[in-house]
Amino acid sequence: MKRIGIMTSGGDAPGMNLAIRAVARKALSSGLEAYGINYGFAGLVAGDIHEFKAADLDDMVSQGGTMLYSARYPEFAQEESQLKGIEQLKKFGIDALVVIGGDGSYHGALRLTEHGYNTIGLPGTIDNDIPFTDFTIGFDTALNTAVDAIDKIRDTAKSHQRVFAVQVMGRNAADIALWAGVASGADAVIAPGFDYDVEAIANKLKKNRANGKDYGIIVIAEGDANSDAAPEFIDQLKQYGDFDARATVIGHVQRGGVPSAKDRVLASKMGAYAVELLLEGKGGLAVGILENKVQAHNMLDLFDAKHQADDSLYQLSEDLSF
């Protein structure tokens, strides 16, 4: 093995640049060459590929997004596109790859491994919805962004005695909502996989009001990218009482910004480990961190598994928001 290719695919996540840096610098320090592939699998098929030098890799540590850009490219599920991508790998002499992205990106990575190009997947998504890893690259930063926004919303909620339903990202995963709900001291959390009762939440807010707390914060997961989750909840809530209530959607600000120290270290550990796996001749693996130990699992096992949110966080939120 002489050359490693690196790409980011799917939605961007803070810390992706640190993963790119770690893969490239680990490859260079191991006597290999590192090549960046712009725009994910679309860029691979188009041959939008360039060589990395060590000097290219240090200015990115504090930058969000991905310096390799990203794109969704469902056409790569077709063998014709895969073969075009492989022709580009041959053209540039790339022997193995690291793909940074979510579960959709892993399917493309596995296809390349099946075609004889060992590929390792790194979990780059704010949703924290990848099996076999406690945390994904970008989750911690997105969580902190959400909590910071909720803290600010609390200020105005308290000033105007209002209830705010704050919608966070995460697709079908509950993690951002659960963690942000506990961290921000929300009065309730509404998230996929957890039952909720609007009337019970309304009664809780009324009880709080009677006890001197005349505002409320409800954290709501978007749930399958439903942009109306928070407004719909507000409409339902008003059926159970005279609430001065507002809906706020935090939105894509959670996908950007300076990556947290935790995401930087996590991405660096995972990126370096991916190169070690490739040096051992391994492919078709997804890197994760479990109980603070970086490890790898077969991608096929990952596709058959389902990410489980931390149920105890939901119960903790309920216990602390009586």
From Swiss-Prot:
Binding site for substrate: T125, I126, D127, R162, M169, G170, R171, E222, R246, H252, V253, Q254, R255
Active-site residues, as the UniProt record annotates them: D127
Activity modulation: Allosterically activated by ADP and other diphosphonucleosides, and allosterically inhibited by phosphoenolpyruvate.
Cellular component, GO annotation: 6-phosphofructokinase complex
UniProt main location, coarse: cytoplasm
Positions bound to Mg(2+): D103
GO terms (BP aspect): canonical glycolysis; fructose 1,6-bisphosphate metabolic process; fructose 6-phosphate metabolic process
UniProt pathway annotation: Carbohydrate degradation; glycolysis; D-glyceraldehyde 3-phosphate and glycerone phosphate from D-glucose: step 3/4
Residues the record lists as binding ATP: G11, R72, Y73, G102, D103, G104, S105
Record's keyword annotation contains Zinc: no
Keyword Lipoprotein: no
Localization of this protein: Cytoplasm
EC number in record: 2.7.1.11
Cofactor: Mg(2+)
Record SUPFAM superfamilies: Phosphofructokinase (SSF53784)
SUBUNIT field: Homotetramer.
Function as written in the Swiss-Prot or TrEMBL entry: Catalyzes the phosphorylation of D-fructose 6-phosphate to fructose 1,6-bisphosphate by ATP, the first committing step of glycolysis.
Family: Belongs to the phosphofructokinase type A (PFKA) family. ATP-dependent PFK group I subfamily. Prokaryotic clade 'B1' sub-subfamily.
Protein name from the UniProt record: ATP-dependent 6-phosphofructokinase
Organism: Pediococcus pentosaceus (strain ATCC 25745 / CCUG 21536 / LMG 10740 / 183-1w)
Lineage, uppermost ranks: Bacteria, Bacillati, Bacillota, Bacilli, Lactobacillales
